[in-house]
């Protein structure tokens, strides 16, 4: 929130004193991305001796904009992002490293590179979560348990036919095992058939319809239908066809 001209003079004084990194924080997480990006660009264009230092971003997530602001920063002249695994930090947290890394990877047009081994992101997230006793929310981008889980019937059918329909990231790229088809009352026949095939059951249409009717009854009574439920369902309906 500091006046740009005053901030530029402060940066010049820091460079004159030998600073090689100029960290520009949004400590309260107040800035909008276009505002933060414009501030970084102003400094890149107006600070004398800026070529001697690296502009760095340090954004907080009070309004959920830490990652967006950080990307706006490096899109306008910053060359360093201060971030944390899982976005842990004061109050609502800081910029999440895993989000920044995958944005840069998925958007080559940004002209940026991190050098981070993305296949270790999920493992590292779990390690930090364990060491800090801080649970990662299930719907956390990139590393959450539901990041690659699909429970809606339409989405499940699309992912089964072509993963890229609903996933812009291959789970293996971030060290996740695979996409997850979660069977619930919202799942369709395609999802049920897919899961049954994974378990070794290949049902013709009439048998699948019968299994699906039983599945819906089961799904209405519990939050999720797991593999053991499906084994029992197949046996109870005498639909065993294993290959």
State where each predicted segment sits:
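Hydrophobic faces of well-ordered beta-strands that scaffold small-molecule active sites
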Residues: 22-24, 53-59, 81-83, 100
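Short secondary-structure transition/capping segments
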Residues: 4-7, 34-36, 92-96, 149, ...
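Active-site-proximal loop/turn and secondary-structure-junction residues that shape catalytic pockets
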Residues: 1-2, 26-30, 59-65, 85-89
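Flexible glycine/proline-rich, aromatic-decorated loop/lid segments
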Residues: 65-81, 88-103, 148-171
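Short secondary-structure capping/turn micro-motifs that flank functional sites
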Residues: 1, 30-31, 89-90, 145, ...
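Alpha/beta enzyme core
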Residues: 1-53, 71-78
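Predominant activation on well-ordered alpha-helical scaffold segments within soluble catalytic domains
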Residues: 8-12, 37-44, 68-75, 82, ...
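A mid-to-C-terminal "edge-of-domain" accessory segment
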Residues: 102, 109-243
């Amino acid at each position: 929130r500091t006046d740009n001209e005053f901030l530029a003079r402060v940066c010049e004084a820091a460079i004159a004193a030998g600073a090689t990194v100029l960290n520009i924080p949004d400590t309260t997480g107040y800035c909008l991305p276009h505002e933060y990006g414009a501030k970084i660009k102003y400094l890149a264009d107006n600070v004398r001796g800026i070529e001697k230092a690296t502009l760095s971003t340090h954004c907080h997530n009070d309004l959920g904009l830490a990652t967006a602001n950080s990307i706006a920063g490096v899109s306008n002249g910053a060359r360093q992002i201060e971030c944390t695994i899982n976005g842990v930090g004061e109050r609502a947290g800081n910029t999440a490293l895993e989000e920044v890394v995958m944005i840069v990877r998925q958007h080559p047009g940004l002209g940026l590179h991190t050098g981070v081994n993305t296949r270790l992101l999920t493992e590292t997230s779990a390690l930090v979560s364990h060491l800090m006793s801080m649970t990662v929310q299930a719907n956390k981008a990139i590393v959450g348990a539901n990041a690659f889980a699909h429970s809606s019937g339409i989405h499940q059918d699309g992912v089964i036919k072509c993963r890229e329909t609903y996933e812009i990231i291959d789970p293996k790229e971030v060290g996740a095992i695979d996409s997850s088809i979660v069977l619930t009352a919202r799942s369709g026949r395609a999802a049920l058939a897919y899961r049954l095939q994974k378990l070794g059951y290949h049902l013709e249409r009439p048998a699948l319809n019968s299994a699906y009717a039983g599945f819906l009854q089961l799904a209405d009574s519990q939050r999720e239908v797991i593999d053991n439920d499906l084994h029992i369902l197949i046996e109870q309906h005498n639909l065993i066809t294993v290959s």
